């Protein structure tokens, strides 16, 4: 057999080994996650096999996901800070981290963590996510009216609202902006719209939790 072909086959075989091991590790992780066995998950992610086959961000993110499932606020905070302080991330990974925990900190009104996440996302190319986070932060946390003109204009556009699944949440944000402006009647009008339009959508529980 041609020597180069042999080398290519060996390289291909070696290359598949980490993939096979990674699949087995992830299968074990899912089983442990289903059983809420955090200690075993931590031990699994700390093994040499996991360190070799699973990239650093993925290992830490899987551990964070376990804490999120258990709603362990203290460990969530510790793990988020650990990832942000010590784990190199690309733009996609930064966005994934922010999406996972941002609304948790909004619910807690944890301004310092929200600011950290905003600063992190500002260094990515995910401008839509940054705008969304900044809009929520300014409206719900800072009590601002920065996005008043933009939201009012968007929600007055019938075609825009009809084809936009985010409409209920935008209505909710505008209701809060009116409240921040001291316009209680308009605030109530848009709050009722948001509650009605969010029924049966992913935003229903989110709006009620932040209401």
Region spans (language model):
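Acidic, Ser/Thr-rich low-complexity segments on the non-lumenal side of membrane proteins
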Residues: 41-73
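Generic helix N-cap/helix-start motif at coil->alpha-helix transitions
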Residues: 17-27, 52-61, 90-99, 125-137, ...
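Residue at a conserved register position within TPR or TPR-like alpha-solenoid repeats
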Residues: 32, 67, 101, 105, ...
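Alpha-helical transmembrane signal-anchor/signal-peptide segments
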Residues: 26-38
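Structural motif corresponding to the intra-repeat A-B loop/turn of tetratricopeptide repeats
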Residues: 35, 70, 107-108, 142-145, ...
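N-terminal signal-anchor transmembrane alpha helix of single-pass membrane proteins
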Residues: 1-29
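Alpha-helical repeat scaffolds
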Residues: 40-48, 73-86, 110-125, 146-162, ...
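Extracytoplasmic/periplasmic C-terminal soluble domains
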Residues: 138-211
């Amino acid at each position: 057999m041609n020597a180069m072909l042999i080398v290519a086959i060996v390289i291909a075989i070696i290359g598949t080994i980490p993939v096979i091991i990674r699949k087995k590790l992830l299968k074990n992780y899912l089983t442990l996650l289903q059983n809420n066995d955090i200690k075993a998950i931590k031990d699994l992610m700390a093994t040499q096999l996991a360190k070799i086959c699973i990239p650093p961000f993925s290992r830490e993110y899987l551990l964070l996901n376990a804490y999120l499932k258990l709603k362990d606020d203290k460990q969530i905070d510790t793990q988020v800070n650990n990832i942000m302080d010590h784990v190199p991330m690309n733009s996609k990974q930064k966005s994934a981290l922010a999406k996972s925990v941002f609304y948790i900190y909004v619910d807690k009104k944890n301004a310092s963590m929200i600011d950290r996440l905003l600063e992190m996302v500002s260094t990515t190319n995910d401008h839509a996510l940054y705008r969304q986070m900044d809009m929520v932060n300014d409206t719900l946390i800072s009590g601002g009216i920065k996005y008043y003109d933009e939201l009012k204009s968007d929600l007055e556009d019938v075609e825009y609202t009809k084809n936009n699944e985010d409409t209920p949440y935008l209505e909710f944000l505008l209701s809060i902006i009116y409240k921040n402006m001291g316009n209680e009647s308009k605030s109530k009008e848009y709050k009722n719209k948001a509650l009605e339009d969010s029924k049966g959508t992913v935003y229903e529980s989110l709006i009620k939790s932040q209401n």
